[in-house]
Amino acid sequence: MRDMEELCPSALLMNYVNPMAANSIGMGMASKIPFVGLCHGVQTTLDLIAGYVGEKKEDIDFVAAGINHMAWFLKLEKDGADLYPKFREIFERPEYFINDKVRGETMRHFGYFMTESSGHLSEYLPYFRKNQKALDLYCDQPGFGGASGAYYYFCDMLARKYQEVDYLSFEKGDLTPRSKEYCSNVIEAMETDKIFRFNGNVINKGYIANLPDGCCVEVPMFADKYGLHPESVGKLPQQLAMLNQMDVSVQLLAAEAALKGDPELLFAAVAADPLTSAVLTLKEIRDMVAEMLEDQRQWLPQYEGKSLRTLDIIPTPAGLEGVAVPLDPALAIVHRFGKLADN
């Protein structure tokens, strides 16, 4: 982005790099370069939904909005008829539910389907990976269906397979048909004024009213020769905003920690993570972050010379008497109950 500020300050940066939301927030904090984050979650999930309900995706009128990897299909209609009742009924059938357990269970409890695979979604919420029972119930499918470390092992395998490849000579010169990714369509729209509608990731400026301004949201928008035009969707259903906000807090903290090189903010970001906090104590989280920071320091120059504070467990052996202090109001009530019980 620094190079773009010098060489092409009005050009659009299209980002595909994860973590999409945290990266986007960081870009918004660090630079004035216009950017959009592009993902394939909405369009590929629409294909999936169309198959489930037996409709052509071109015939489905939909609105999707939220945050990257956790946007919600707020509307699913065909010719004005709501497709959600049929879709929800389908996911009550075991032969369908087994294909997408985490997304299906989330929809069953909160009412809406979201845009990321079950394996990915299980990483963003505190409900599905917190213990072995939950893993066996919801994350028992191979690969991205829930297997631990699936994304890492897949990327590592590809990196090893192609580490000696010259990519410029590896790819054929012939143009292949367009994929489901948005990038070339956005470029075409901006160069030819052929309007293209899609979902993109941008800094929230009231586009989703019940998520904080300054976070990264994934909302409907269109591109034309004048640029990008994000659309406001109003308020998400409150339960969906609650689920999004769990990870928005992590993303805001992570971006600020990265830009400032602040180990304590880094710890706070990890401590705020819903899955981490579901399985670890604060002391365990602090020790883990300290270890990870040391192991990855060579790639994190902004943390040079900085370390996380060490906080040991304060011992409170059996029989230890606390000092005399004014009673906390809640403890005072308990104390009063005790007196009443003794009388």
Where are these predicted regions, by residue range?
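Long, compositionally biased stretches enriched for glycine and/or charged residues
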Residues: G51-L340
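Acidic, His- and aromatic-enriched active-site or binding-groove loops in soluble protein domains
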Residues: I33-V53
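A glycine- and small-aliphatic-rich helix-loop capping segment at beta-alpha/alpha-beta transitions
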Residues: M29-F35, G80-A81
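A structural signal for short, well-ordered beta-strand segments and their strand-loop junctions
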Residues: L13-V17, G37-C39, F198-N199
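Short acidic, glycine/serine/threonine-rich loops at helix termini
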Residues: I25-M29, L48-I49, L74-L76
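An acidic- and aromatic-residue-enriched active-site/binding cleft used to recognize and process polar
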Residues: N18-A21, H40-G41, A65-I67
